[in-house]
């Protein structure tokens, strides 16, 4: 009886080891499979001295919307307005006789023409309104943000990704466009 139990135990152990090895192989295969993503090269904007590379933002699809995962460094710490802008450009343009960083990106992407700034989940707001981007004390940003109304990568291609100085209250009151500051960093979504 002891010999039968011992043989059964070895058989179960061997079967379990094979099953775990197969499951681990499938897991590794899933991890290495190519997930479709867009990689946006982001530059800190300086129309006088020239732009400086500060990293990338990866955009991927999820069941809950598009996920924007930053891999950024060298930025001012704190919360920053984070938006998709209309045009695929980060070039400076002149406004009122002054060169403005990133003005070539145009305004917030608003294909439904709501003309309202709002929360990323609000149906009556710019589609380009994203959750605020958090930058750590060391200037790095790695926390992903979710855009629940955006579902497919093709929706955002041909626009730009903008980071503004200062936070974003997701409203047009008391200040327009969420009260965010100047355009700080930008990348074209290709």
Curated annotation (Swiss-Prot):
Protein family per UniProt: Belongs to the Cu-Zn superoxide dismutase family.
Disulfide bonds: 90-186
Keywords noted in UniProt: Antioxidant, Copper, Disulfide bond, Metal-binding, Oxidoreductase, Periplasm, Signal, Zinc
Location in or out of the cell: Periplasm
Keyword Endoplasmic reticulum: no
Record-given protein name: Superoxide dismutase [Cu-Zn]
Lineage, uppermost ranks: Bacteria, Pseudomonadati, Pseudomonadota, Gammaproteobacteria, Pasteurellales
Transmembrane feature ranges: none
Positions of Zn(2+) binding: 108, 117, 126, 129
Assembly information from the UniProt record: Homodimer.
EC number: 1.15.1.1
Segments for region (Disordered): 162-181
Function text: Destroys radicals which are normally produced within the cells and which are toxic to biological systems.
Cofactor note: Binds 1 copper ion per subunit. Binds 1 zinc ion per subunit.
Superkingdom of source: Bacteria
GO CC aspect terms: periplasmic space
Gene Ontology molecular functions: copper ion binding; superoxide dismutase activity
Cofactor: Cu cation; Zn(2+)
Reaction equations catalysed: 2 superoxide + 2 H(+) = H2O2 + O2
Signal peptide: 1-23
Residues reported in the UniProt entry to bind Cu cation: 83, 85, 108, 164
